[in-house]
Structures are given as C-alpha cells and as structure tokens.
Amino acid sequence: MRRLLVVFAVIAATLVPVGHPRAALSTDAEDRSVPLRLWYTSPAANWESWGLPIGNGAMGGVVFGAVNTERIQFNEKTLWSGGPAPGRDYTNGNWREPRPDALQQARRLIDEQVQVDPGPITALLGQSKVGYGSYSTFGELRLAFGDLGPASDYVRDLDIDNAIASVSFTAGGVAYRREFFASYPDGVLVVRVTADQPGALSFDVQQTIPSGRSNAQRTLSGGRLTVAGNLDDNGLRFESQVHVTAEGGSVAPNGQVLTVSGADAVTIVLAAGTDYADTYPDYRGPDPHARVTATVDAAAAKSYAELRAAHIADYRRLFDRVELDLGQELPALPTDQLLSAYGTGTLSPAHERYLEVLYTQYGRYLLISSSRPGSLPANLQGVWAEGTSNPWGADYHVNINLQMNYWPAEVTNLAETAQPLHEFIEALRSPGRVSAREMFGADGWVVHNETNPYGFTGVHDWPTSFWFPDANGWL
C-alpha cells in the first residue's frame, strides 16, 4: 500500500490526463473489457508495501496471504487513544492556564523584528500536547492451518472491480482459495475459505490483543470468539466478535481459539466497535456490545453468496460511475513486476496505460473503502493502521492532508464519500467555539493545524506547524 493510503486522493485527481488523444470517460461500466486487478505471486512481505487493503468506511483490513498462517490486520475507525479520561486534564488543546497578554506580545515581536524565529512565538502561544492520542489497530485475525507443505500456483490479488481480495494456491494435492471483503451494507469483514476436496479444511481461528489493553478478555461460545475490554489510556470501551460457520466438519472452542475440523468450506464474519461518539465534550456513547452482537448475528444468518452479492452491488453502485479508457491493454505481468518495468521502455504503451488506469481507479477504490456515511472521515492513513501509536497519530491534518483525501470525491462522482467529512467539520464547531473564546476572546470557532476525533481545536508546541487559526476556512 505504501503511502498511497496517505495521498490516494492525488491518484484520482488526475482522472483525465490532458493531451492524451485516446482518453475517454464513460459512466457505464457494467462490463469492463480490461479487468482492474492488483496481483502477486507471493505472500505480502510487509504490511505497508505489499498488504492488500479492504474496507467498508468504518472498518479496514489488510490481507497478508501466507500459506500456513493467514493474517488479517484490522481496524475500526473510532479506536483512538487520547481525549477525555479520568485524571487527565484534557483541554482540547486550549491553553491550560490564562495567557491574557500572549497574543499582544507575539504581535509586538513581529512588529518590531518583522522576521521572527518561530521558537519565541511558540513559547508564547504554544504548549505541549496532552491527551492527543493516536489511531490504533484493533488486532489481527489469524487462521493457523499448520504445515500444508510446499505451495504451487500461488496467486494473491485484489479485484478492484468488485472490491474482493483473494489468495489461491495448491498444496498437498489440494487447491485452496480464500476470499476477503469488507461489506458496507452488512457492516462486517468477511473471509471465505474453500478447498476442492471435501473435508480438507482444518485450522484454528484466533484474534490477537495488542498492548495497552490490560483488561481485555476473550470469550468463546459455539462458533463465536469475542474480545472486549477498555483501552488503558482513556478507558474507551471496545469489542469485536468473530463468527465462524463451517460447511461440513465442525467448529468448536479450543482454549483461546476456535478450531475448525474437517470442513468443506468456512465463512467467517467479523464486526468491531467502541463506545466513542462524536459529541463534545465527553465523546462517549453506548457500550458497543449490543450493536456488535446484532451486526454479527445478522451477517452470520446469511449465506456467503448473499453477503458477497450485497457487497458487490453496493460497491459497484459507486465505483461503476466512472470508467477510464486510455487505450490500455491487460499485461501478463504481476503488479510488482509491472511497476518495476514502467518507464523503462520494456512495456508497450498500452501496457503502461493499463498501470495508469489501475493507479487512478485504485485511488477511487481506497476512498470508497475508507470513507462511507456513518463513521469518521478518512484519516492520514485512510482507515488502515498497523500500530497502536502511528506516524502523526494517523490523525486529521487540516492544513492540507484531510482535504487531499477528498479531492476525488466530487470530481470522480463519489460525492457520498464526503459526508463523513462534512459531519466531522460540523462536530468541530462546539469545541472550536471554546478555543476561539479562550484564546482570542472572539466569537465564531477555530481549529488549528491538526485535530483528532476528540475535538482538539487548540495548539501544540511544534514551531513549524502549531499556529494555523484560519484552518476552518481552509476546510
């Protein structure tokens, strides 16, 4: 994924290259003559560069594709440290002590010196962050198959046309296939495991618990694994539920895992949530248990075919609004080899055009996957983050990065994806009014260079970026 997750808007902003004589835009993409697909012949070596991202706006997953142990790292967009917490003086970034003359002193310095080093200004107006927090991984869903032996015919791919990732290979004379998608209509991540021989599927299903969740507990019952607890940092309540349905064979609790034995096919659904609510000043809502349970119950009651069909129909309702024709032709090279060959003169022009079209439509795919109504907007990493403390907190930089996420929304006919951004801006007004009054003695509202889901509208102490009181107008 590299930093496509940070700047995917730039990809789609170049939807119609200027001056290319064969560029054409179509709004009817029911039957694509050239399929859009990322594909590789080996498992992902690392999360950022090679993992395959799936998402439904609120949740995201990254598929690794290892033969013996499949890993799906997953996120839920409201799982954030920081914000209000018992014993924490969280002021939304507003000054923790009155500074009645700070603005006047800063203005005098600028008037007197014209060019002022940012350090003294930061000392007057900035302060260290308290409770800013970070977006965090929810954990990993792992499928442990044991040693299947040497694999052949290995393919790992992401079907951009239908928003489905897959892994297929042959081992021990058995052809295995796994499919993965994130369903917006059903609110779950879905995994399907099949084999071409009856009773060939036996594996353990487990979920990891990252650090900073000392009271998290696993509960297993029937074919369901529940992980619930609170973040140590702020007490945020979280819960995920995994439901495993085996066709043929059996599934049963086995210590801390669910064990599938002798199955023909297996469907796994995963939902997650927290008690976060975008409401100032507490930013808390109901315990997620009832909501997560209802979501998993409803999805588990459906067949895999029903879940898959609903997902594809929902996704293509958005994605199929735009088709880009640059005269491209489908190359036979895996995507990593295609990237390496691009611009070297070894590809035909039509094959290079294919990569350009794929790159553009991948940007639209990432926006659809990371921003849908009903959750927070896409952050610095969309909806995908591997760690518990991510670069820049995977926050919302409102100087330009947040806006960049949504550059493709209107111009590539994905206006609905911007609704979370509009609602997020509206929610910033309440804490922003307090910042305007306490810091400037002014009406209206303000937000500075960056913010988080907890209404951080004040300042920090990085001299190069702490002061940007007109950011709300820039939004």
Predicted regions and their residues:
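Aromatic-residue-lined binding/catalytic grooves and analogous aromatic/hydrophobic interfacial grooves
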Residues: 25-463
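Extended, hydrophobic alpha-helical segments in both membrane/secreted and soluble proteins
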Residues: 401, 468-475
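Secretory targeting and sorting signals
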Residues: 1-24
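Short, surface-exposed loop and linker segments with low hydrophobicity and enrichment for Pro/Ser/Thr
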Residues: 3, 260-262, 472
